[in-house]
Amino acid sequence: MSESPESAVNSQSLKSGYEFYLKGHALGREGRHEDALLAFSQALSLDPNLAIAWAGKGFALGKLGRYEEEIECCEKAISLDPYCVDAWNNKGFALGMLGRFQDKLECCERTLQIDPESATAWNNKGVALGMLGRFEAEIQCCDRALELRPRYLSAWVNRGYAFGKLKWFEEEIICYDRALRIYPFYFSALIKKGIALINLKRYTDAIDVLDRAHSIELGNAKALYLKGLCLSMLGKHEAAVDCLEQALEINSTIADAWVVMSNSCFMLGRLEESARAFDKAYYIDVKDVRSGLVKGLSLLKMGKFDDAIRSFSNVLGVLLR
């Protein structure tokens, strides 16, 4: 029995739509997210019911910082295919980027109901738990992710982060070293290892690690600030001020950098500069407190109590700086 002309046209559209989806997926893997977004949109113009293309479009939008739109695309994918793991994972990621960690946790749970062997979902669940202050549970999730995918860089780093929040700094460093053994140029792992070494008061070792990080990402304000902090703690205040000035020229909103700058200038007898730096830090803190309180109250009204508590805790951290 021959295929009807109408059926043949629909079959060709579906094939072409899926081909554009594959193109978008490949472009996304190359980091070409604008081009990937266009390819996914072309796929959906040919086949609006292709759930994985909606999930792919959402992923591309998320990579471009358009998280609300990512959520909309993922919800469309889920309406077409409630078992689309990519859509649930991507929606959870976007919710996390918007600070909605309780909602992210629920997405991860739904993903794991569909696919209990999803390393990505276990890792994402760990992140959500960690952001809600449940660090031991985060470690357990990362352990499960690493059982499924032993070379999962993000899971090693997130596991280290959780150990750090529990003040188990030696264990934290071991995790970052495992990640760096897999990929020596992992900037985030180097920065976090530097912070762990600072917490252990190993300032010279931290400087070596932060210099490696800076060689990978030249002009990174955080790497420069942390190096400046180490130099200040070692009593090398002239060098600290030079480093902090570079950091603040790149990003003048790092309140902690202004605090360290104020301290080093004071130790050098540069009292006017010390006072100006302290004023800068105070001004930034006031804005952070105000925005944190507004966000926390908004989350309370939405019934997102765990996320609200986290926001208020961040405010308290600023006030106790």
List the predicted regions and their residue ranges.
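Conserved structural position within tetratricopeptide repeats
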Residues: 42-45, 76-79, 112-113, 144-147, ...
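Conserved alpha-helical positions within TPR/SEL1-like repeat arrays
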Residues: 18-29, 52-63, 86-97, 120-131, ...
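TPR/TPR-like (Sel1-like) alpha-helical repeat modules
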Residues: 283, 297-321
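TPR-adjacent "capping" and linker segments in tetratricopeptide-repeat scaffold/adaptor proteins
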Residues: 2-19
